[in-house]
């Protein structure tokens, strides 16, 4: 697969902003449907998204189900990288991670992107 067939989605939010979580899943699922590889790069509170069962705990009224989007994302091979520093600072070293999730830092992100990728990030703020 070519490097430009990879999409990185940055997310810093979890239950504090379910709409950002929803948007990240919508973008990721659409990328996978288009035949691209999708990776959620999770930092700050966003790492919670990669914990087992999280997707069932949040929703956005009148929007697609985050749990259903999560299931499709994982089924189609979507991946999650949880920032190791963020995992440590939140005391989540013993967390149970969802399928496709790994605690990986910047070097692994750079390896995934190789020379080029589409990068989609939620605004920080």
Mark where each language-model region is:
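Basic/polar N-terminal segments that are highly enriched at the extreme N-terminus
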Residues: 1-4
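Short, glycine-rich nucleotide/cofactor-binding loops
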Residues: 8-22, 54
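Histidine-anchored nucleotide/phosphate-binding helix
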Residues: 21-36, 40
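Short internal beta-strands
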Residues: 38-43, 80-84
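N-terminal beta-loop-helix "entrance" segment that forms/cooperates
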Residues: 46-60
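A glycine-rich helix N-cap at a beta->alpha junction
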Residues: 57-89
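Short terminal interaction segments
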Residues: 90, 104-125
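Short, electropositive alpha-helical surface patch
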Residues: 95-102
């Amino acid at each position: 697969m070519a490097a430009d067939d990879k999409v990185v989605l940055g997310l810093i939010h979890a239950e504090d902003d379910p709409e950002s979580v929803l948007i990240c899943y919508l973008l990721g699922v659409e990328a996978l449907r288009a035949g691209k590889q999708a990776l959620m790069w999770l930092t700050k509170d966003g790492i919670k998204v990669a914990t087992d069962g999280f997707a069932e705990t949040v929703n956005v009224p009148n929007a697609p189900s985050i749990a259903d989007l999560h299931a499709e994302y994982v089924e189609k091979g979507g991946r999650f990288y949880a920032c190791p520093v963020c995992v440590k600072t939140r005391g989540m070293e013993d967390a149970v991670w969802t399928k496709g999730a790994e605690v990986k830092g910047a070097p692994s992100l750079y390896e995934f992107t190789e020379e080029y990728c589409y990068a989609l990030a939620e605004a920080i703020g």
